[in-house]
């Protein structure tokens, strides 16, 4: 999240590999949040990155990046997909298997969004031995793990009798 001037150093100090980054999220166009982005992307290219990367950020981010690359005659070895969000509405920016990222408009001197990472609800933990002993088929086990009551062989099975509830889904706001 965000890419100020020290982003490469911060990634190295925290033993994060540049090439493993799948996405970059920019909150607003102030220098301390964006000036490290061209250098980070250029370093990835110099290191031979081939995999595309997605960048979510405010309007004009893509034009700024293209202008910067043009000024220094930079050529990326990989595709850069810029997705610009609106500073006026909550938007789902990215959805993955285990989390969702949303933009949340906030007041600032320039268009700005906070970023909220929301963990999806976790499945219930099934007592596997109990389910096996009862001969529960796969589809019944899956329903119980989703927290859904289900009928099986004339019985109404309730998830709380077969599973332990998951911890509450977490969220992080930046």
Residue ranges of each PLM-predicted region?
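Residues that form or flank phosphate/diphosphate-binding pockets in enzymes
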Residues: 2, 32-35, 64, 110
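Active-site metal-binding motif and surrounding structural segment of the metallo-beta-lactamase
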Residues: 5-56, 84-86
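Conserved beta-strand hairpin/beta-sheet module of binuclear metal-dependent hydrolase folds
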Residues: 1-20, 50, 115-117, 124, ...
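Small/polar loops that bind or transfer phosphate-bearing groups
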Residues: 2-3, 26, 56-57, 103, ...
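Active-site neighborhood of divalent metal-dependent phosphoester bond hydrolases
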Residues: 49-86
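Metal-dependent phosphodiesterase/nuclease catalytic metal-binding core
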Residues: 86-174
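Alpha-helix N-cap/helix-start and coil->helix boundary motif
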Residues: 8, 18, 31, 61-62, ...
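Structured loop/turn residues at beta-strand edges in well-structured enzyme cores
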Residues: 16-19, 78, 97-99
């Amino acid at each position: 999240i965000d890419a100020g001037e020290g982003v490469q150093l911060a990634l190295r100090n925290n033993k994060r590999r540049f090439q493993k980054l799948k996405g970059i999220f920019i909150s607003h166009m102030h220098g301390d949040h964006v000036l490290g982005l061209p250098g980070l992307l250029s370093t990835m290219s110099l290191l031979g990155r081939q995999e595309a990367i997605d960048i979510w950020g405010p309007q004009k981010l893509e034009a700024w990046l293209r202008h910067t690359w043009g000024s220094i005659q930079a050529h990326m070895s990989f595709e850069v997909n810029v997705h610009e969000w609106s500073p006026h509405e909550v938007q789902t920016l990215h959805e993955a298997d285990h989390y969702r990222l949303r933009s949340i408009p906030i007041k600032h001197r320039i268009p700005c969004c906070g970023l909220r990472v929301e963990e999806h609800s976790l499945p219930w933990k099934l007592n596997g031995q109990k389910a096996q002993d009862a001969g529960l088929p796969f589809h019944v086990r899956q329903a119980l793990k989703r927290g859904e009551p289900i009928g099986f062989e004339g019985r109404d099975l309730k998830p709380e009798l077969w599973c332990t509830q998951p911890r509450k889904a977490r969220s992080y706001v930046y």
